[in-house]
């Protein structure tokens, strides 16, 4: 009842269908409010043309599987999988592998030959699958051992065969991680570690491997793989998400250097003990050290991480150079009240007080050069950090720019910083404010500082 009264018009599950009638009988919601929800839903359907006669006569009425599985769409699925792969660790430039030096590769793990797992949830029928094993097999000879019967990995009976495969191969690829039996809608994870005996399998195979050991992680959420990060025998770590129908091809392309990884982590990877300090019932974002609460997300969390939000390595290297950027900006105020509320004591102004429309975006120009030996795609992340304040986040992502740069080439990126939008923060009371003083822009490995001050514009009384 509360949800409908608050404006929820549509429930894609059965909850409203089951409980709404009883809510009306008890007087918790009126029939008029139900009618409004129905009218809003049907209005959208009408705007979409769903009541405009025979569906097959509409512009998209005859689309079917043959339209989904065109070569262009299948290529798009492959490209999306490639771009989504994140290289987290690459010791001694172990990757990419070489078809000349790594003629036999052991492919091990419960996700090494999966199909539907790669699709994740909320997906249609795939046009076809290429598993990681099949993808790697297009480059080199493979020796396959699952190691575990599934991702739950409840026993270690198959570990001996996996170790034997690693001893015979020139390189070993472990494809581990999760699936929808562990993380999905209505399914909560028990922790952040690899399930069951997966960690034991990884460590034992890494000890047995005579060549580089590559850990490929398939999951939707973060995994605490501190053990692998700290194990020098594990040469590289890759996260592939749930890469879709072409996942196996994309993984192999990255492993053997046909594609250069350029993805970035879309979330922070926390250590396992993080969840012990984070009650499910507490959704506060800001950290509270007094009660041992670590905070949520890269914006507020204080503590160690396995891998930070935005991390993503490449097979090439990029250099950044600040070509242009303002250092001092005046924020015009437009009311006497704003002037009174924007003293040096408060050190902030409400976003509603400046004339935001009169503020042109701040232009920051950065030159990005590919200084390595391989063409690559680089995602330039731009973070802002406000002046110190208890109400402020440590940093926030204001934007990103994705550019493909050939080896030895350089491109200029223009970053438009909107003061009211990008340099404002929300305080504890939900009020958006612009902190005065020195703001830091973190652009790749560059830092640039912009100082904000106020000035009195045209007064509106």
Swiss-Prot record:
EC code(s) of this entry: 3.2.1.-
SUPFAM superfamilies: (Trans)glycosidases, Beta-D-glucan exohydrolase, C-terminal domain
GO BP, sorted A to Z: xylan catabolic process
SMART domains the UniProt entry points to: Fn3_like
GO molecular function, one term: hydrolase activity, acting on glycosyl bonds
Keyword flag Thylakoid: no
The keyword Hydrolase is annotated on this UniProt entry: yes
Coiled-coil zones: none
A Pfam family of this chain: Glyco_hydro_3_C
Tissues in which the UniProt entry reports expression: Equally expressed in the abscission zone and surrounding tissues of both fruitlets and leaves.
Induction note: Up-regulated in both the abscission zone and surrounding tissues after wounding due to embryoctomy.
InterPro entries: BXL, Fn3-like, Glyco_hydro_3_C, Glyco_hydro_3_C_sf, Glyco_hydro_3_N_sf, Glycoside_hydrolase_SF, Ig-like_fold
Keywords tagged on the record: Glycosidase, Hydrolase
Protein family per UniProt: Belongs to the glycosyl hydrolase 3 family.
Role of this protein: May be involved in cell wall metabolism, related to senescence.
PANTHER family from the UniProt entry: BETA-D-XYLOSIDASE 1 (PTHR42721:SF8), SUGAR HYDROLASE-RELATED (PTHR42721)
Protein name: Putative beta-D-xylosidase
Organism: Prunus persica
Classification lineage: Eukaryota, Viridiplantae, Streptophyta, Embryophyta, Tracheophyta
């Amino acid at each position: 009842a509360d949800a409908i009264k608050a404006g929820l018009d549509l429930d894609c599950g059965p909850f409203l269908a089951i409980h709404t009638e009883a809510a009306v009988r008890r007087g918790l919601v009126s029939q008029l409010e139900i009618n409004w929800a129905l009218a809003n839903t049907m209005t959208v359907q009408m705007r979409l043309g769903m009541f405009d006669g025979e569906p097959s006569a509409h512009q998209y009425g005859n689309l079917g599987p043959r339209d989904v599985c065109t070569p262009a769409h299948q290529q798009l699925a492959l490209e999306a999988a490639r771009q989504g792969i994140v290289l987290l660790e690459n010791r001694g430039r172990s990757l990419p592998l070489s078809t000349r030096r790594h003629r036999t590769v052991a492919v091990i793990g419960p996700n090494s030959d999966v199909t539907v797992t790669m699709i994740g949830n909320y997906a249609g029928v795939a046009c076809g699958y290429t598993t990681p094993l099949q993808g790697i097999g297009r480059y080199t000879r493979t020796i396959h051992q699952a190691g575990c019967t599934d991702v739950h990995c409840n026993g270690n009976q198959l570990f001996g065969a996996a170790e034997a495969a690693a001893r015979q191969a020139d390189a070993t690829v472990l494809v581990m991680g999760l699936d929808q039996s562990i993380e999905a809608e209505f399914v909560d994870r028990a922790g952040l570690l690899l399930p069951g005996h997966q960690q034991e399998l990884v460590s034992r195979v890494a000890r047995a491997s005579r060549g580089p050991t590559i850990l490929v992680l398939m999951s939707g959420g973060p995994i605490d793989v501190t053990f692998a990060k700290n194990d020098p025998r594990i040469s590289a770590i890759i996260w592939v998400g749930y890469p879709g129908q072409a996942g196996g091809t994309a993984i192999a392309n990255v492993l053997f250097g046909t594609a250069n990884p350029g993805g970035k982590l879309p979330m922070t990877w926390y250590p396992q003990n993080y969840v012990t300090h984070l009650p499910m019932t507490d959704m506060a974002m800001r950290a509270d050290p007094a009660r041992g609460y670590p905070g949520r997300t890269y914006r507020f969390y204080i503590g160690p991480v396995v891998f930070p939000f935005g991390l993503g390595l490449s097979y090439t290297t990029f250099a950044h150079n600040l070509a242009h950027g303002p250092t001092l900006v005046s924020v015009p105020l437009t009311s006497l009240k704003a002037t009174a509320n924007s003293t040096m004591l408060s050190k902030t102004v409400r976003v509603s007080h400046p004339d935001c429309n009169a503020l042109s975006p701040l232009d920051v120009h950065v030159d990005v050069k590919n200084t390595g030996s391989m063409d690559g795609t680089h995602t330039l992340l731009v973070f802002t950090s406000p002046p110190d304040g208890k109400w402020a986040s440590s940093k926030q992502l204001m934007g990103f720019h994705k550019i493909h740069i050939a080896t030895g080439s350089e491109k200029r990126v223009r970053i438009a910083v909107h003061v009211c939008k990008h340099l404002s923060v929300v305080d504890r009371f939900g009020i958006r404010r612009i902190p005065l003083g020195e703001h830091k822009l973190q652009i790749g490995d560059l830092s640039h500082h912009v100082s904000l001050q106020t000035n009195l514009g045209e007064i509106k009384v």
